[in-house]
Amino acid sequence: MHTTNYYNTFIEISDDCPVFESEIPKERGGNKTVALLQFEMIAHNPYQFTSDEVLFNIHALRKDLPPNEENKQEFFSKGQACFRASPLGKRYGWGIHFDENGKMALYNLDSPEYQNLKADPNLKHVKAMRNKKL
């Protein structure tokens, strides 16, 4: 089974992120976007979920599937995009921190916590994927 989990890692916003302060994703067409669902699940429950748990639970919700082990195995039988590809770091300006257990929390781009995590030499640092190819 493939995994998207990170440990002791900080995902910084992408180099071409279009915002200078973090934004909360909005609904589109009366429906919650993947970005909004990710934001709500992580921001309202910091350090409660791993990347795999967030991605699978949102997949199950959007596909109206029971979040059972069988569906989880099927979902992760194919590689899934990790949180570097999330619109939270690419478009909305949120840093994503993973602790030693792989549990994640969001940090506002203009917060002191974001700057502290960005400068922390004890963490692995990666950037969210760029929005456009060079």
Where is each model-derived feature located?
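Long, contiguous N-terminal structural blocks used for assembly/anchoring
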Residues: M1-D52
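A recognition module on extended beta-rich or small alphabeta surfaces enriched in W/G with H and D/E
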Residues: A119-L134
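Amphipathic protein-protein interaction modules
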Residues: L55-Y114
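Surface-exposed beta-strand edges and their flanking turn/coil or helix-capping segments
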Residues: E21, P25, F56, L109-S111, ...
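Surface-exposed polar/charged interaction patches
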Residues: I13-D16, L61, K78, D120
